[in-house]
From Swiss-Prot:
Component of the cleavage and polyadenylation factor (CPF) complex, which is composed of at least PTI1, SYC1, SSU72, GLC7, MPE1, REF2, PFS2, PTA1, YSH1/BRR5, SWD2, CFT2/YDH1, YTH1, CFT1/YHH1, FIP1 and PAP1. Interacts with YSH1/BRR5, FIP1 and RNA14. It comes from the Eukaryota. InterPro entries: Pfs2-like, WD40/YVTN_repeat-like_dom_sf, WD40_repeat_dom_sf, WD40_rpt. The lineage of its organism: Eukaryota, Fungi, Dikarya, Ascomycota, Saccharomycotina. One of its GO terms (cellular component) is nucleus. This is Polyadenylation factor subunit 2. It comes from Saccharomyces cerevisiae (strain ATCC 204508 / S288c).
């Protein structure tokens, strides 16, 4: 009797389920980035001696966009990573203090406070693998110039050396007594420098992992360090409001910059030529110096919020990006405007941005923040209204545009008062400019020392290549 009632109950459930309308499935297409097509176009044009086509502000010109290294002149604005493409996060979310692209640009390495490395694919933005790298929070990591090695540092002061397949080959225990904040390789990868909250910098021999020299002179935590891409010159930034330049051969401080009034958070040499040095501080300022002219200040930009980190563009030597405490991104061009950003993304992240990284090819830009997410940004298609004013990150979520819905391959909305991006003015030279809402600066172009200059870099005494 019980079995008969059970069968009758199951039949009734099946009838009820068959009468219910089927669940509606929302299908979203995952975006992917293919950089091979622009390179095929570039190779074809060079092989047959053809000029590169000028990209006009019209959607059909998308197929004519070249790779980033083809735009080094006035059309360099095309290389701005203004289009939000994808958001990624680990299943178990942690704050992300550092991200770094692999040298070939195919994967993004993400380091977390849990001591893990996770790898994300650069084309489809899919998760690839996860590994436990350190016992404490990974605070920084850096690839060598020859792409054969990677070094990482953690909050316990430990340094680890990795092969490209993430096989650890050496561990330097107690390299510093406090958390390691930054590290950098020398131009020939024979040495690397680290800085820490223990107020000192250390130079290490990469071949044997031995400490060679201690650079002492800062009076508080050393927040950042960088090695000149060509010369024997190290720059460091500290909580004592100073930026110092060091001679790695003697270990002496050769110059100090006293322009800042608060903690200097980050400093970086220009990666292409190394003529310029940029630093940001908690006094809400960003300054660019020319190392060839006694550290002459070329630019000073102030903001209402703190700058947290910075990154130079890998292809265009005059362009760089600043990340702010409120989660916004600001893109600058030294040849366009010295007083304000040429592009601002106000809601790039929900919380403070901790790390930036340009793909070595220059077509993808990755950002990480304390909202525990990684966001990928790419170059915009011509006349795409969402490129510079996307409701995804400008907090104007209209017409149902939000994460997961605007991932269609033809994600171009109708023009409206929110993000209606007009084409460039008729007076502008037709130089392959994509849609720019408030982007064109009509001020006269200003020449900056240190960019496209033939003056040699080795003008500081004792600093030869």
């Amino acid at each position: 009797m019980d079995g008969h009632n059970q069968n009758q109950y199951q039949n009734q459930n099946q009838i009820q389920q068959s009468q219910q309308p089927p669940l509606k499935k929302y299908v979203t297409q995952r975006r992917s980035v293919d950089v091979s097509s622009p390179y095929i176009n570039l190779y074809y044009n060079r092989r047959h001696g053809l000029p590169n086509l000028v990209v006009e502000p019209e959607t059909s010109y998308t197929i004519d966009i070249m790779p980033p290294n083809a735009y080094r002149g006035r059309d360099r604005v095309i290389n701005l990573p203004s289009k939000f493409t994808h958001l990624s996060s680990n299943k178990v979310k942690h704050v992300i203090p550092a991200i770094q692209w692999t040298p070939e640009g195919r994967r993004l390495v993400v380091a977390t406070y849990s001591g893990e490395f996770s790898l994300w694919n650069a084309s489809s933005f899919t998760f690839e693998t996860l590994m436990q790298a350190h016992d404490s929070a990974v605070t920084t990591m850096k690839y060598s110039h020859d792409s054969d090695w990677m070094i990482s540092g953690d909050a316990d002061g430990m340094i680890k050396i990795w092969q490209p397949n993430f096989s650890m080959v050496k561990e330097i225990d107690a390299a510093h007594t406090e958390s390691i904040r930054d590290m950098a390789f020398s131009s020939n990868d024979s040495k690397f420098v680290t800085c820490s909250d223990d107020n000192i910098l250390k130079i290490w021999n990469f071949s044997n992992g031995k400490q060679e020299r201690v650079l002492s002179g800062h009076h508080w935590d050393v927040k950042s360090c960088d090695w000149h891409p060509e010369m024997g010159l190290i720059a460091s930034a500290s909580k004592d409001n100073l930026v110092k330049l060091w001679d790695p051969r003697s270990g002496n401080c050769i110059s100090s910059i006293l322009k800042f009034k608060h903690t200097v958070l980050k400093t970086r040499f220009q990666p292409t030529k190394g003529n310029l040095l940029m630093a940001i501080s908690k006094d809400k300022s960003c300054r660019v110096f020319d190392i060839r002219y006694s550290m002459k200040e070329l630019m000073c930009v102030r903001d209402e919020t703190d700058y947290m980190t910075l990154e130079w563009h890998p292809i265009n030597e005059s362009m760089f990006t600043l990340a702010c405490y409120d989660g916004s991104l600001k893109h600058f061009d030294l040849l366009q405007n010295l007083n304000e950003p040429i592009l601002t993304i106000p809601y790039a992240h929900d919380k403070c941005i901790t790390s930036l990284s340009y793909n070595p090819v220059g077509h993808i830009f990755a950002t990480a923040a304390k909202d525990r997410t990684i966001r990928f940004w790419t170059r915009a298609r011509p006349i795409d209204p969402n490129a510079y004013d996307d409701p995804t990150y400008n907090n104007k979520k209209i017409n149902g545009w939000f994460f997961g819905i605007n991932n269609d391959i033809n994600a171009v909305r109708e023009k409206s008062e929110f993000g209606a991006a007009p084409p460039p003015p008729a007076t502008l030279e037709p130089h392959a400019l994509p849609n720019m809402n408030g982007f064109i600066n009509k001020k006269p172009r200003q020449e900056i020392p240190g960019i496209d200059s033939n003056i040699k870099s080795s003008t500081l005494p004792g600093l030869s290549i």
